[in-house]
């Protein structure tokens, strides 16, 4: 099992933290375990409350059912169903930008 460094950033929220996330754990769950308060609602990849934007790196979010291909192409991720597949940087609190 691999573990990746996931950096969560959001200037408006004063957030800039790097956490270690195993490749079989969702990023949102790992953030909560580390005491980082991220927005979420359904926890099933079916809404946009937990949306973030991938600045660098890669994730597997094949369990999500909300984002369309254009949004995924633009780098949006649903942290509640995203597994890291490399070290990555994610800008959090991005739900508003989807609309």
From Swiss-Prot:
- Provide the leader sequence positions: none
Q: Which GO terms describe its biological process?
A: electron transport chain
* CDD domains (alphabetical): fer2
What's in the keyword line of the UniProt record?
2Fe-2S, Electron transport, Iron, Iron-sulfur, Metal-binding, Transport
Query: Per UniProt, where does [2Fe-2S] cluster bind?
Result: 42, 47, 50, 80
Give the cofactors, semicolon-separated: [2Fe-2S] cluster
What does the record's cofactor remark say about binding? Binds 1 [2Fe-2S] cluster.
Record carries keyword Lipid metabolism: no
Which InterPro entries does this entry report, sorted A to Z? Answer: 2Fe-2S_ferredoxin-like_sf (IPR036010), 2Fe-2S_ferredoxin-type (IPR001041), 2Fe2S_fd_BS (IPR006058), Beta-grasp_dom_sf (IPR012675), Fd_pln (IPR010241)
**Subunit field text:** Forms a complex with heterodimeric ferredoxin-thioredoxin reductase (FTR) and thioredoxin.
Tell me the protein family, please: Belongs to the 2Fe2S plant-type ferredoxin family.
Q: What does this protein do?
A: Ferredoxins are iron-sulfur proteins that transfer electrons in a wide variety of metabolic reactions.
Name of this protein: Ferredoxin
Q: Give the species this sequence originates from.
A: Mastigocladus laminosus (Fischerella sp.)
Phylogenetic placement of the source organism? Bacteria, Bacillati, Cyanobacteriota, Cyanophyceae, Nostocales
